[in-house]
Amino acid sequence: MDAEKNLDFKVDIRDIDLSALPINDDTVDLDGYANAHGTLTGTLSKPFFHGDVSSKSIMINGEELTDIQCKLDSDGGIKNHLLGSFKQAPKGVLSAELDYNHEQKLLQGNIVAIYGNVRSILKMAKADYNVDGLAQGEIAINPHGSGSGIFVDVWVDDISINDLKYEEMKFKGHLQDKVWYFDDVKLMETKDVTDKGIVAVGGKVDLANGKLELEAGAVDANPALVTAFMSDPVEVTGDLNMFVQLHGTLKDPEGNGSVEVKNGSVAGIGFDDFTAMLSLANDNLKIEQAMLNKDIYKASAYGDVPLDLFRSKEQRRDPNAQMNVQLNLDNARLGILQVISPMVEWGVGETQGQVKLAGTLEEPLVYGAVKIPDGSLKFKHVQTVIENIHTDIEFEGNKVALKDISAKLGKGSFKGSGTYALRSNEREAYQLDLVADNAEIASDIFTGRINGNLTVTPQRFIVRPEAGSAPPPGKGPRFSYRPLLK
């Protein structure tokens, strides 16, 4: 340093403690050690650093970046120019060219990512979501000067959202004045296929005022998207076509939509077609009209499902929230039992009555009554068809009570009553108490004629693999249940 206080130093600083820097605050937790090598010029009151900054590893909000190599020109005020690259597990490479004006609090520049770890990047931004994928693209920060915003144009490969997988996602959007604009956002189940397996989102979210205006559509997509953010999602399959509009606030959104699922299933129970018209207001999802079809059978529904039921129990605003959905079975016919129970192979005959769905999605309850004036039913593992069925069915929450059953079984008949549990272990799933009169039955475990009193309950048995087939996965024998007569 000369008499004019001009600086001309060579700088070689090792193991700079990044956690001690004044940039640490509530949004950024910086940790690790860096080395600086270069020159310090300028004056004592306005020093200027030119050189290299490097580190083997740094942590940003608990997420690691490695092999940091940067060139830095900085006066600590108006001019701060950074050109650098760094790596991110498992195989990400990111580069950045940034300018920061400390006096104007203005950050400008570009960040380019190749195979960037999406989950890790989100955590760096203190957004901890169950989202995975590898991102490639560019982020431009204030490219047209102060306030022009952040522009994102990236593709994400092998993306999963709450374990729901897509091959590719396109995200093109920008943030301006604390408003996120979704310019072109698409999720694609199959790469380069643009006419099916697509979910698209457009609109904006005002982060400052907590408002949103969004539209979302799906074409032959995986319907598991609908349940992806449930705390305990049920298994849903089929082809989803959907259009949804949302507006209002982030806390209490409003909107409407239409949903169709073709050739689908819920928890392994199949249907041909499901359609619904929905509306959302006051933290409640209203089913304006819904129709479920299976072969020639139909069931319709309407009612209310509080959004609390899609949240974990700890996050529910109303811990006592329950759904209230009316289900009309007058046109369902007996074949609809295939949708309700996997034990039923097929059924024919009229059904008369209505039931109400209550409870939660995890523990649904059913109330109401259905009458079967004359029908036929075929159970799995039982070869004999039950004909001329007459019964009154009462739904009592988790229990289905079969009152005054009478039916023809072979050349004989039976009458009696029974119960069926909607949720229970298989050992206690059902019990039928019957009086048989020359009833003929052929099943996997019994074939013959029955007279007298009998009880039908589930029996556990070992599932033995067929000759030449591979053994079942896992250790030990695999068990299943079938009807036991006693």
List where the protein language model places each region.
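Membrane-proximal interfacial segments on either side of biological membranes
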Residues: 1-87, 94-188, 195-401, 405-412, ...
